[in-house]
């Protein structure tokens, strides 16, 4: 899935991912209680973990 970040995010290595960057979701983890976390990667290869409130997806069927 591809999406766009909805706010600035800092990953675990201190690298800032800016609002509006295009990202791809590589992996989804079920945290329970209807909550999920994803491993995302930017177009420049920066990886970060985030819940899905920080990324907007345009999913088409």
Question: Where is each model-derived feature located?
Answer:
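SH3-family beta-barrel domains
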Residues: 1-9, 29-33, 59-60
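Intrinsic disorder/low-complexity segments
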Residues: 2, 24, 37, 47-50
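Short acidic, glycine-rich loop/turn motifs
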Residues: 7-11, 42-44
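Short, structured coil/loop segments at alpha-helix boundaries
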Residues: 11, 28, 50-52
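Short, surface-exposed secondary-structure edge patches
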Residues: 12-16
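Conserved beta-strand/loop element in small beta-rich adapter and peptidoglycan-binding domains
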Residues: 17-28
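Short aromatic-glycine-enriched beta-strand elements
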Residues: 33-39
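Intrinsically disordered, low-complexity, charged/polar segments
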Residues: 39-61
